């Protein structure tokens, strides 16, 4: 007989969307700060583009597994109104910067993927507490409204939803 815990963990292990209780469902979502390259970025300034906020940690194997997929998918979206904000929530910005330097050495860096550290003094968001040990993907439409929130593994179908928002 399955335990209650195993039943509750099933959707998560399958990568099914969970309610994003920490993400504001009313009011205007806020995300603003500086990228690791010193570029000011905010959801407000990105209106007119579909934005995927990918919350990750260098200590999260699932997160690290998904980051190359995000970069590969960006190749098909060059010149389109689509941006990925990779929001790192490690204790230190050094972990994010080490990852970014490795990308630059391999030529895998992408202009449409902007890295931000959630712990920076100039960072602001109203997303509340987000899980440290699993990725969280937040999709904002061109008007800046939260369209979808997924915790855990990012399902392949999410890219179909993004395509509809970008091309629709």
Where in the sequence are the language-model features?
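Short, internal strand/loop/helix patches
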Residues: 100-136
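Thiol-based oxidoreductase modules, predominantly thioredoxin-like and allied folds used
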Residues: 81-95, 110-120
